[in-house]
Amino acid sequence: MTTTNTRHVTLFHAPQSRSGGVLALLEELGADYELHVLDLRHGEQRKDVYLAVNPMGKVPAIVHEGALVTEQGALYTYLADLYPETGLAPAIGDRLRGPYLRWLFFYGSSFEPALVNR
């Protein structure tokens, strides 16, 4: 009998990009994942085969049970929620969930750009 891991995800990754954090998180979670590496220098993110997966042509992106999830903060939240037993994110309904989300999105919208754009 074959069993399926309903938490299996496919990560579309490009080295030296924001997808490195998602790859590190998958490892930290001990997640079951398949890795597809894109070469941004050769424009693989703009080829039809990848645009069929992610019409925005950006990385990182994951596919989980047929659903596409993109954007770094959304990916971190989604994956932490997919593996609640790791305790990496407060559960929905936990009083710390709001502050957790605030700092997570502050990082992606304010802190990281300040570091990258200086």
Model-based region annotation:
Residues T2-R118:
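GST-like domain detector, emphasizing the conserved glutathione-binding G-site
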